[in-house]
Amino acid sequence: MEDVYDLFQRGTRLLEEGEFHQATVPLRKAAAIEPEKASIREALGRAYFRSGHYEEAAVEFGAVVELAPTNDYALFCLGRSLLECGRAQEARKPLTLAAQLRPERRDYRIYRERAAKAA
């Protein structure tokens, strides 16, 4: 069995190199071994999002939000993933929460407003 840390490191390295689809392979394996590890689920969500798999990204970011409800980045990414899936109404809540948690983040406010207009 492969070590979770090695799988996570390989996946994040591939993410950094722009190999988003390839990054999902070790990150999926790591998430299967340690599904309660928010850092793994967040990295997998990022890999899915960057490879255009928005539904899968929403699932992963949703899992991170369940594990860490005040993780502003996960809330933001969940909202963005839902927007990309055409689910603007659902995207409003996580985007609003992210913007409230980090009011200095202009990008959070922009996407919150986009979701409100699209809903």
Task: State where each predicted segment sits.
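Alpha-helical segment of the N-proximal tetratricopeptide repeat
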Residues: 2-33
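Structural signature of tandem alpha-helical TPR/SEL1-like repeats
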Residues: 17-28, 51-63, 85-97, 119
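Mid-chain, well-packed structural core segment of small domains
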Residues: 62-84
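TPR/TPR-like (Sel1-like) alpha-helical repeat modules
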Residues: 80-107, 113
